[in-house]
Swiss-Prot record:
Its main location: membrane. Disulfide bonds join C178-C213. Residues 1-22 form the signal peptide. One of its GO terms (molecular function) is copper ion binding. This is Major prion protein. Residues 26-104 are annotated as: Disordered. It comes from the Eukaryota. Cu(2+) 3 binds at H76, G77, G78. It comes from Ateles paniscus. It is linked to PrP is found in high quantity in the brain of humans and animals infected with the degenerative neurological diseases kuru, Creutzfeldt-Jakob disease (CJD), Gerstmann-Straussler syndrome (GSS), scrapie, bovine spongiform encephalopathy (BSE), transmissible mink encephalopathy (TME), etc. One of its GO terms (biological process) is protein homooligomerization. Cu(2+) 1 binds at H60, G61, G62.
Length: 252
């Protein structure tokens, strides 16, 4: 990692040094730079005929009475009564636009749903709510329970509550805590709605929530590892020196 950082530093120093020298070199003069211009584009006292390429009474190449190439009575190339090329009554084509489409409205429900996943839930002591998952396909060993699960899986949670993975020593502790708090919250919600959970429901819900907590742990562990790798990369001395040098070149 250190060798890679040093080679990156050498490459960027060489590249930016060459660009810096190119920027400081004076630009060579083009054809007829600084000399007399024809026709009539030199010093203020030069002979201007015809005046800048237009006809009689045409300061900038427009028709009769056209200061900047527009039609009759058009100061800057617009239609009748158009000062800067806009429509009728439009100064520059940017104001007074009729039938302007309204901006699309943001769907507040989508914003609320996106903010809910991964956010700290108030009143639960630092627990976060995970993203919605598809309920896993689980076989319980007999046809009755398998059929019961397929018919009632919608009654079981599809999101789990959890704490950050860095607060646990291993996966088992994370999953155990995740299962307990998720089942507790779902049971309270179900009871509040007036529904009852049977022993079969509790058994199946424990299996379902356990699988989802394992999946949540794998996701959080991977994200935590990636964040740690990024911090290690950007905290290495060669990368810090490289970033400082680039900032110096941009600002300077």
């Amino acid at each position: 990692m250190a060798n890679l950082g040093y080679w990156m530093l050498v490459l960027f120093v060489a590249t930016w040094s060459d660009l810096g020298l190119c920027k400081k070199r004076p630009k060579p003069g083009g054809w007829n730079t600084g000399g007399s211009r024809y026709p009539g584009q030199g010093s203020p006292g030069g002979n201007r005929y015809p005046p800048q390429g237009g006809g009689w009474g045409q300061p900038h190449g427009g028709g009769w009475g056209q200061p900047h190439g527009g039609g009759w009575g058009q100061p800057h190339g617009g239609g009748w009564g158009q000062p800067h090329g806009g429509g009728w009554g439009q100064a520059g084509g940017t104001h007074n636009q009729w039938n302007k489409p309204s901006k699309p409205k943001t769907n507040m429900k989508h914003m609320a749903g996106a903010a809910a996943a991964g956010a700290v839930v108030g009143g639960l002591g630092g627990y976060m709510l995970g993203s919605a998952m598809s309920r896993p396909l689980i076989h319980f060993g007999n046809d009755y329970e398998d059929r019961y699960y397929r018919e009632n899986m919608y009654r079981y949670p599809n999101q789990v509550y959890y704490r950050p993975v860095d607060q646990y020593n291993n996966q088992n502790n994370f999953v155990h805590d995740c299962v307990n708090i998720t089942i507790k919250q779902h049971t309270v919600t179900t009871t509040t709605k007036g529904e009852n959970l049977t022993e079969t429901d509790v058994k199946m819900m424990e299996r379902v929530v356990e699988q989802m907590c394992i999946t949540q742990y794998e996701r959080e562990s991977q994200a935590y590892y990636q964040r740690g790798s990024s911090m290690v990369l950007f905290s290495s001395p060669p990368v810090i020196l490289l970033i400082s040098f680039l900032i110096f070149l941009i600002v300077g």
